[in-house]
Swiss-Prot record:
The lineage of its organism: Bacteria, Bacillati, Bacillota, Bacilli, Bacillales. Substrate binds at Y159. Pfam families: CoA_binding, Ligase_CoA. Its EC number is 6.2.1.5. It is an enzyme of class 6 (ligase). The gene is sucD. It comes from Staphylococcus aureus (strain MSSA476). Heterotetramer of two alpha and two beta subunits. GO terms for cellular component: cytosol; succinate-CoA ligase complex (ADP-forming). This is Succinate--CoA ligase [ADP-forming] subunit alpha. GO terms for biological process: tricarboxylic acid cycle.
């Protein structure tokens, strides 16, 4: 089992003829992802990297049976691409694009309410189910199949955590990058619920950062519902108030959203937190040993 995607997921790439999309399409195909279609308006009928290109998402879905799309479309047009995917009733749309205007995303979020399409992102690295399906921009080779779920607001910290786990012989089920923007689709609790219900996932790494209250809300949900150990890390511990740290959503405002507050809440809800990024792997091992599941997590031959 895994969450959201697996080896049978049929994927379309929106904006496939752009240079960034082409590069990552090849990487995803090399990983074994079933990319069955691309979409670029006005370029239907072309074939790139062996993938047929269509003018619309609807046409691509009807012709190929794709159920998930990944968006590599420039920021001014990305919101419309998400809406088009939702109108086609895709199961999930993963938006990699950064710098989408906040008001665009507010409209998108409102539009998606009550619809079946799940949005992951924007401004995220994507979703990967180890050794099965990679949708996004993450380095595939560091991910190995196992029993730890990863959910994160940060792309590069996800890679750091996954690499540490793999080096320790601990594989992963699925890693989900939910993105660093203030208005996004899938949140921590959505992914934690999925991991909690997934038989293969035995423990979870959750990586947050300053800004907003998503981590605090997730911590309360974990305390009330989670049946598996969760370890956390919060980025931005040295950030001064009012200074945006990389992501649009990573800003402390009105005294809220500090790393200190988030860490305190996580710890009070039973989530062990790593003090630095380099300790994420060892913190998970510590929690796994306490839960008596450490041996079960050792799935990677070192």
């Amino acid at each position: 089992m895994s969450v959201f995607i697996d080896k049978n997921t049929k994927v379309m790439v929106q904006g496939i003829t752009g240079s960034t999309a082409l590069f990552h399409t090849k990487q995803m195909l090399d990983y074994g992802t079933k990319i069955v279609a691309g979409v670029t308006p006005g370029k239907g009928g072309q074939v790139v990297e062996g993938v047929p290109v269509f003018n619309t998402v609807e046409e691509a879905k009807n012709e190929t049976g794709a159920t998930v799309s990944v968006i590599y479309v420039p920021a001014p047009f990305a919101a419309d691409s998400i809406l088009e995917a939702a109108d086609a009733d895709l199961d999930m749309v993963i938006c990699i694009t950064e710098h989408i205007p906040v008001l665009d995303m507010v409209k998108v979020k409102r539009y998606l309410q009550g619809r079946k399409t799940r949005l992951v992102g924007p401004n995220c690295p994507g979703v990967i189910t180890a050794d099965e399906c990679k949708i996004g921009i993450m380095p595939g080779y560091i991910h190995k199949k196992g029993h730890v779920g990863v959910v994160s607001r940060s792309g590069t910290l996800t890679y750091e955590a996954v690499h540490q786990l793999t080096e320790e012989g601990i594989g992963q089920t699925t890693a989900v990058g939910i993105g660093g923007d203030p208005v996004n689709g899938t949140n921590f609790i959505d992914v934690l619920k999925a991991f909690n219900e997934d038989d293969e996932t035995k423990a979870v790494v959750m990586i947050g950062e300053i800004g907003g209250t998503a981590e605090e809300e997730a911590a309360e949900w974990i305390k009330a519902n989670m049946t598996k150990p969760v370890v956390g890390f919060i980025g931005g511990q040295t950030a001064p108030p009012g200074k945006r740290m990389g992501h649009a959503g990573a800003i402390i405002s009105g005294g809220k959203g500090t790393a200190e507050e988030k860490i305190k809440t996580l710890n009070s809800c039973g989530v062990k937190t790593a003090a630095t990024p380099s300790e994420i792997g060892s913190t998970l091992i510590e929690a796994a040993k306490e839960a008596g599941i450490y041996e079960a997590l050792l799935t990677v031959n070192k």
